């Protein structure tokens, strides 16, 4: 179980780190993803630290989404991803709660966060279902032995 969480969080954080670098490189976002890491001097080290932070956050999201039941994983992933993306951009831009603030939101950033969250949700819910299926008895509980 721990290996699955580790592999999923590493894959999603690698995807997010590379995509954030691309968004910043092509100027699709106005902010710098590693600006908050001003304590670290080297640019590559900042990206590595961001990767580690994203890996930890991905593992936490995995553990949270693993406990969701009776809702399709795609729906959970999209809703959770949109919420994370909107909250992140609201905090980054320090936006007010007005309708015109939506124009500042970056669609590519929202899509990237949502796809990563859908990946984590699909993996978490699939593996939880596999664990539950493995815990089932091989016979009916009403069967007389």
Give residue spans per PLM region.
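Alpha-helical membrane-associated segments of multi-pass integral membrane proteins
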Residues: 3-23, 85-134, 138-145
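Hydrophobic alpha-helical transmembrane segments
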Residues: 5, 48-52, 75-79
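Hydrophobic transmembrane helix segments
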Residues: 10-54
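Loop-to-transmembrane helix junctions at the membrane interface
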Residues: 58-84
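Generic low-polarity alpha-helical segments
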Residues: 1-11, 44-48, 61, 65, ...
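Short juxtamembrane and helix-loop transition motifs at transmembrane-helix boundaries
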Residues: 32-44, 66-74, 120
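Transmembrane alpha-helix boundary/anchor motif
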Residues: 56-63, 115, 119
């Amino acid at each position: 179980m721990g290996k699955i969480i580790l592999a999923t969080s590493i894959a999603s954080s690698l995807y997010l780190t590379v995509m954030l670098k691309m968004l910043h490189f092509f100027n699709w976002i106005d902010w710098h993803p590693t600006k908050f890491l001003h304590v670290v001097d080297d640019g590559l080290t900042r990206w590595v630290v961001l990767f580690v932070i994203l890996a930890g956050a991905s593992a936490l999201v995995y553990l949270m989404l693993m406990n969701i039941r009776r809702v399709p994983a795609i729906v959970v992933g999209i809703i959770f991803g949109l919420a994370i993306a909107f909250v992140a951009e609201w905090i980054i831009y320090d936006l007010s709660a007005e309708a015109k603030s939506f124009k500042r939101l970056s669609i590519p950033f929202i899509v990237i966060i949502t796809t990563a969250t859908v990946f984590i949700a699909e993996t978490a819910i699939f593996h939880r279902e596999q664990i539950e299926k493995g815990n089932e008895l091989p016979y009916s509980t009403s069967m007389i032995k």
